[in-house]
């Protein structure tokens, strides 16, 4: 699935006036492309407000990052649990009206989650780096910054906000992008969770051979439907390479109960990322405890 970067609009001058001409490909082809195009603008605005140098200065005063992978590998419950904080999504709209990120983070931690994922995308998920900052103040377990990262600047934003790990999505990045961003992340002490949706993306990531934490997203990017068979297929077909490279495998999306977790564990998943099903529950604390087998 090709995700294009936003094409620039050409312009013409008439007298002393300049007019923008709509580009023939100026409309995104799908929701993921729309998010990527919007992200370009979001980052441009952020750079004008806070310079890279300012982020670097802030990072210097921060403590060392927590080991995200160790937190998953050392989990007493299997598969390990990454609980996600998100207020909204393109497929669901508002997921939780009474959204208190700090309280949700504390309930996740108390319930037994090994790590927490925080959505920082503003327009489509109603998140933000300010949300990550607030959650970081309340919890001690590792935090993943989940966003549509295109530029090194965003990794600096994540680190400055208190993240220990960051998401890279193979579908929106070239091999060169993945390699370069992974080096920047390593420099910042951030663990990278690289996300794939199909065999083509997984092969790309395995061939790059720098990632030891891979997420398989069970959500179809075109239909937005979820199917746990995606984890089954990819984990089985690439089991040898995953084992040989000591890769920790995370199953993402479409997971609602303990039975789902046990199923993807049997497919080869070492950890799961669960968001919407927890955010939708009245009793979040009880929901987490059920997933990790403490209730």
UniProtKB/Swiss-Prot annotation:
Signal peptide: none annotated. It holds the Pfam family IGPS. The keyword Amino-acid biosynthesis applies. One of its GO terms (biological process) is L-tryptophan biosynthetic process. It is an enzyme of class 4 (lyase). It catalyses: 1-(2-carboxyphenylamino)-1-deoxy-D-ribulose 5-phosphate + H(+) = (1S,2R)-1-C-(indol-3-yl)glycerol 3-phosphate + CO2 + H2O. It comes from the Bacteria. Its EC number is 4.1.1.48. Pathway: Amino-acid biosynthesis; L-tryptophan biosynthesis; L-tryptophan from chorismate: step 4/5. InterPro entries: Aldolase_TIM, Indole-3-glycerol_P_synth, Indole-3-glycerol_P_synth_dom, Indole-3-GlycerolPSynthase_CS, RibuloseP-bd_barrel. Keywords: Amino-acid biosynthesis, Aromatic amino acid biosynthesis, Decarboxylase, Lyase, Tryptophan biosynthesis. GO terms for molecular function: indole-3-glycerol-phosphate synthase activity; phosphoribosylanthranilate isomerase activity. Belongs to the TrpC family. PANTHER family: INDOLE-3-GLYCEROL-PHOSPHATE SYNTHASE, TRYPTOPHAN BIOSYNTHESIS PROTEIN. This is Indole-3-glycerol phosphate synthase.
């Amino acid at each position: 699935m090709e995700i294009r970067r936003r094409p620039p609009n050409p312009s013409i001058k008439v007298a002393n006036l300049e007019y923008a001409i709509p580009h023939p490909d100026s409309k995104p082809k799908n929701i993921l492309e729309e998010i990527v195009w919007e992200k370009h603008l979001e980052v441009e605005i952020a750079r004008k407000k806070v310079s890279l140098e300012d982020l670097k200065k802030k990072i210097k005063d921060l403590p060392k990052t927590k080991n995200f992978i160790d937190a998953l590998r050392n989990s007493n419950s299997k598969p390990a649990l990454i609980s996600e904080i998100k207020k909204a999504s393109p497929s669901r709209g508002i997921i939780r009206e009474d959204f208190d990120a700090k309280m949700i983070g504390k309930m996740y931690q108390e319930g037994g989650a090994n790590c927490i994922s925080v959505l920082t995308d503003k327009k489509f998920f109603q998140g933000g780096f300010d949300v990550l900052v607030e959650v970081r103040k309340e919890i001690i377990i590792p935090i993943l910054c989940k966003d549509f990262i295109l530029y090194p600047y965003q990794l600096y934003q994540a680190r400055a906000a208190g993240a220990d790990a960051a998401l890279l999505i193979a579908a929106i990045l070239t091999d060169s992008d993945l390699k370069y961003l992974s080096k920047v992340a390593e420099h910042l002490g951030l663990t990278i969770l690289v996300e794939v949706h199909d065999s083509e993306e997984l092969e790309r990531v395995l061939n790059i051979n720098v990632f030891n934490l891979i997420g398989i997203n069970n959500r179809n990017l075109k239909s937005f439907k979820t199917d746990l068979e995606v984890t089954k297929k990819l984990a089985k077909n690439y089991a040898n390479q995953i084992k040989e490279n000591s890769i920790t495998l995370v199953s993402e999306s479409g997971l609602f109960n303990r039975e789902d977790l046990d199923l993807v564990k049997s497919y080869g998943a070492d950890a799961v990322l669960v968001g919407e099903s927890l955010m939708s529950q009245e009793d979040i604390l009880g929901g987490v405890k059920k997933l990790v087998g403490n209730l």
